[in-house]
Amino acid sequence: MTESRQTRLQVKCPTCQTAVVWKPENAFRPFCSQRCKLIDLGGWADGKYTVSGQTESLPEISEPDMAYR
């Protein structure tokens, strides 16, 4: 892919909707900045975003299983 093609590829920052050039030199892509990247991470931590799917139940652990070996 040529450099001119790479510089034309733009996406919107998921946080602030600013146009962002998609190229390897942009360390924050698809975000425009570290700030927008951290805002998005905070949204995941706060439970604002979820990934749909089925929850798997884990097997019960009894006391003897928890003993140090």
UniProtKB/Swiss-Prot annotation:
Q: Which terms does the record give in the GO molecular function aspect?
A: DNA topoisomerase type II (double strand cut, ATP-hydrolyzing) inhibitor activity; zinc ion binding
Q: How is the cofactor bound?
A: Binds 1 zinc ion.
Please list the cofactors this protein needs.
Zn(2+)
Q: Which GO terms describe its biological process?
A: regulation of DNA-templated transcription
| Keywords recorded for this protein, A-Z | Metal-binding, Zinc
Binding of Zn(2+): at which residues?
13, 16, 32, 36
Entry keyword DNA damage = no
Among InterPro entries, the record links this protein to: DNA_gyrase_inhibitor_YacG (IPR005584), Znf_NHR/GATA (IPR013088)
**Free-text function comment from the UniProt entry:** Inhibits all the catalytic activities of DNA gyrase by preventing its interaction with DNA. Acts by binding directly to the C-terminal domain of GyrB, which probably disrupts DNA binding by the gyrase.
Q: PANTHER family per the record?
A: DNA GYRASE INHIBITOR YACG
Subunit structure comment from the entry: Interacts with GyrB.
Concerning its family, UniProt says:
Belongs to the DNA gyrase inhibitor YacG family.
Question: What is this protein's record name?
Answer: DNA gyrase inhibitor YacG
Gene that encodes it: yacG
